[in-house]
């Protein structure tokens, strides 16, 4: 059974080539003209999806082939695109970069292959002419089954440069040029850590989103891209040579475009969207979710899986709320940037006291990365200032100038825990600029219940700090990596 929604993948030859700007611009341009654009981001990154969510007006989902599975990704894609007109997937790093130096595992190419999606490859054209065709040909032929349908040249030059690149690609009988962005035409998006700064911090205005969309419409044949994305669902990958049409006004064509997409979707039988899982909890479990400027790194499908399993998610702000919501059964602190708001978090003594009381009550608390830092005794910022925090865990953290850890991680539970019995395995991602500056006291009652096997960096380590029904770790878990994990968590 094939999913009918037209789809496309925006990939790059490497990081920093303009994938996010192009993806956001295309998503915004299509959405503001009435198309329901469902966006996705390849890999574990929490940051770029915030921009894609703002651009499309719909929640962006991560597609990670290492943390989850092909079957899960196909089902998630089907569910998310059930009412969409088109799906846009932003890749990560270079198209073939992922969790392995030898295979497609965890790469953008793997997702394109699984979704049977045409790839539009972004290439840096600065200082390149016919050599760009060699690059594209290499990417097109490197792995079987990957369909590079079009090329978008970034940092291009004159009209003559455009013509030269187009002729070079045509002569090489490879994917056609569907756009060239002149150097400096895209607004610069500031960066922080891995990817972009958060949308909440940037308060990315509509004017900037529209500027990105305007640049894409001016220099990229958006209609050709949509046509190719739609045609793939019927033709099974036969790509016509694109012309060099320029978009001057999409408003008069958008109704026809939506009609074409609707007709194409009707030709293919779509799988039924995933039905909610029957809950084993007749009365809703009330799970408090820390959600504010300091805590916002959550995989949307993780939260949805909790809801399908019977949880009522109740948001609260550790920055501005003075008390936890009433009648909670558990707390979930995700990651984010607590170091940026450490003073405000420390000044909110009423909330810190309430979190400590909650921990003393024996109810469940789960914390990841920034949440781990918040539950600790103190956080020392880059300026040397130390901020007292919840003190639920007898740990202290310190911010570093350089990246401390960046890696996929497989977790084996060495003891029964909130996420499963001893011996269960889950997968996740670790990314942080802080480190623990003390060890757990031997007589504290805390255990390290994770045996962590990392893909990169230090290979193995013990982590996952647990005491009673409190569990905290630097690792962001993807719950789909262990299907029984959510039910086990809610039952505890």
Model-assigned labels for residue ranges:
Residues 2-115, 119, 123-150, 157-163:
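ATP-dependent carboxylate-amine ligase catalytic core
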Residues 117, 175, 360-364:
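A short helix->loop->beta-strand "cap" motif at the edges of active sites that frequently abuts
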Residues 199-239, 281-282, 291-295, 462-492:
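Acyltransferase
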Residues 338-419:
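Cysteine-nucleophile active-site neighborhood
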């Amino acid at each position: 059974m094939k999913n009918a929604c037209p789809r496309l993948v925006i990939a790059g030859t490497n990081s920093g080539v303009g994938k996010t700007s192009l993806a956001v611009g295309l998503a915004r341009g299509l959405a503001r003209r009435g198309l329901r654009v469902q966006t996705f981001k390849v890999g574990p990154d929490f940051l770029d999806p915030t921009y894609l969510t703002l651009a499309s007006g719909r929640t962006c989902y991560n597609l990670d082939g290492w943390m989850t599975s092909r079957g899960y990704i196909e089902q998630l894609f089907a569910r998310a695109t059930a009412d969409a007109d088109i799906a846009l997937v932003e890749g990560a790093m270079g198209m073939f970069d992922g969790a392995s130096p030898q295979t497609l595992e965890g790469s953008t190419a793997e997702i394109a292959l699984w979704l049977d999606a045409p790839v539009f490859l972004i290439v840096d054209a600065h200082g390149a002419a016919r050599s760009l065709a060699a690059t594209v040909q290499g990417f097109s032929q490197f792995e079987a089954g990957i369909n590079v349908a079009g090329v978008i040249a970034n940092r291009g030059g004159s009209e003559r440069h455009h013509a030269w690149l187009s002729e070079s690609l045509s002569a090489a009988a490879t994917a056609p040029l569907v756009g060239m962005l002149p150097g400096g035409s895209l607004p610069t998006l500031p960066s922080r850590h891995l990817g972009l700064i958060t949308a909440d911090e940037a308060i990315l205005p509509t004017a900037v989103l529209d500027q990105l969309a305007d640049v894409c419409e001016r220099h990229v044949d958006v209609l050709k891209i949509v046509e190719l994305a739609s045609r793939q669902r019927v033709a099974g990958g036969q790509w016509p040579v694109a012309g060099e049409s320029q978009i001057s006004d999409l408003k008069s064509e958008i109704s026809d475009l939506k009609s074409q997409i609707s007709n194409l979707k009707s030709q293919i039988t779509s799988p039924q969207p995933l039905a909610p899982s029957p809950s084993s909890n007749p009365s809703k479990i009330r799970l408090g979710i820390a959600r504010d400027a300091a805590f916002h790194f959550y995989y949307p499908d993780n939260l949805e899986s909790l809801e399908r399993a019977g949880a009522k998610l109740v948001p609260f702000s550790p920055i501005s709320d003075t008390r936890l919501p009433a009648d909670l059964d558990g707390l979930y602190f995700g990651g984010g940037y607590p170091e940026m708001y450490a003073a405000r978090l420390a000044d909110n003594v009423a909330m810190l006291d309430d979190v400590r009381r909650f921990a003393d009550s024996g109810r469940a608390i789960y914390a990841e990365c920034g949440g781990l830092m918040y539950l600790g005794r103190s956080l020392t910022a880059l300026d040397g200032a130390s901020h007292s925090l919840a003190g639920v865990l007898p740990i202290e953290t310190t911010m570093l100038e350089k990246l401390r850890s960046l890696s996929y991680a497989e977790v084996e539970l060495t003891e029964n825990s909130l996420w499963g019995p001893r011996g269960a395995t889950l997968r996740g991602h670790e990314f942080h600029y802080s480190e623990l500056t003390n060890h757990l006291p031997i007589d504290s009652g805390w255990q390290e219940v994770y045996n962590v096997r990392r893909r990169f960096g230090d290979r193995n380590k013990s982590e996952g700090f647990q005491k009673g029904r409190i569990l905290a770790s630097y690792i962001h878990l993807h719950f789909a990596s262990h299907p029984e994990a959510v039910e086990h968590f809610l039952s505890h």
